Amino acid sequence: MDGKLRNMTSVYFTGEQGILCLYRIGSRVANNKYVGAAGGHFEKDELSDAKACVLREMREELGLSESEVENLRLRYITYRLKNGEIRQNYYFFGSLKAGRKLESTAGELHWFSYEEASALDMPVSAKHMMQHYLTVGRFDDQLYAGITEENGTAFVPMVEFEG
């Protein structure tokens, strides 16, 4: 293991109609799968700022600014070893301000009920994150970290403490 990292971010929008996902077309990592409404790889100047990355991706892929989103928060961080690199995914959640319609440059956007979202074809870490969010995370405000293994992802709340 030589310590190669792949840092990625994704944003999911929730609302009365459920959760907004993107059927991504033409991606190097998650092609022809459902993912967050926008997301992608960190730029070098974003490596210490996941929010800067997700805001850039929202602008590039959706034409969306932070002022058009409510309660944008980092909710999940997952880690997975794949093809000799550590893949770190930062998942944000928020809601769109009323009346905002979106189009994506990266694929097809679809709203799904929470029940439908659990059955979507997604990359493995995103799938496990979504299952946890639907059963646990959407009912609280915790930040969760997860290690993805062959049989699932173990999620734990991340909390600040002295020491």
Regions found by a protein language model. Give the residues of each.
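Short beta-strand micro-motifs in enzyme catalytic cores
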Residues: 7, 33, 86-92, 110
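Short, well-ordered beta-strand micro-motif
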Residues: 13, 91-95, 111-113
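A short coil-to-beta-strand element that immediately follows conserved catalytic motifs
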Residues: 65-75
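Active-site-adjacent beta-strand/loop module that shapes the phosphate/pyrophosphate-binding cleft
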Residues: 17, 77-100, 131-132, 136
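Conserved Nudix-box catalytic region and its N-terminal flanking loop in Nudix hydrolases
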Residues: 18-56, 153-163
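NUDIX/MutT-family hydrolases
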Residues: 102-132, 157-161
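Conserved N-terminal beta-strand and adjoining loop/helix that marks the start
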Residues: 1-21, 41-43
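Charged phosphate-binding loop/patch that engages nucleotide di/tri-phosphates or the phosphate backbone
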Residues: 136-163
